[in-house]
Design a protein with these regions (language model features):
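Walker A (P-loop) ATP-phosphate-binding motif of ABC ATPase nucleotide-binding domains
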Residues: 2
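Small-molecule kinase domains that catalyze NTP-dependent phosphoryl transfer to phosphate-bearing small molecules
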Residues: 101-128
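Conserved substrate/cofactor phosphate-moiety recognition/catalytic segment
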Residues: 16-65, 69
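The conserved Walker
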Residues: 8-9
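Hydrophobic anchor at the beta1->P-loop junction of P-loop NTPases
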Residues: 5
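Short, electropositive alpha-helical surface patch
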Residues: 84-101
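Conserved lysine of the Walker
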Residues: 13
Length: 128
């Protein structure tokens, strides 16, 4: 299972990802995490154009697929502002759940397409 946590910068994606990882580990699951900021640093991808973002998300999705095949629960936390990019990522995985975190901020000249059919929409009223 791959959990894709999405939302604007500063919305709390990493916080929720870490809390979810802790809960899953306490239930006995082996968990792997991919965080957008950490992944970008690791891959040294400084290209924030659409092409660069797609390449980064594609690499992350492929890494998550390998871990999913190995039996891990995967938690990915990425801004992924375009619906088609999120769908591209999810197409790599056997089973996934989209988690949208509202709030946060966005870079100038960047539009965030909110999930229209999100499977789980977390709000400030949920305590993890």
């Amino acid at each position: 299972m791959v959990y894709l946590i999405t939302g604007k910068a500063g919305a709390g994606k990493t916080h929720y990802a870490e809390a979810l990882a802790k809960e899953l580990q306490e239930e006995g699951y082996q968990v792997r995490m991919l965080d957008g900021d950490t992944f970008r640093k690791k891959t040294k991808n400084k290209d924030y154009t659409d092409k660069g973002r797609i390449a980064n998300l594609n690499k992350a999705a492929r890494q998550a697929r390998e871990w999913e095949r190995a039996g891990y629960m995967i938690i990915c936390s990425f801004v992924s502002p375009r619906k088609k990019w999120r769908n591209m990522m999810r197409s790599f995985w056997k089973e996934s759940l989209l988690i949208y975190i509202p709030g946060g901020t966005l870079w100038k000249d960047t539009t965030y397409e909110k999930p229209t059919e999100d499977e789980l929409n977390l709000t400030h009223k949920i305590n993890i």
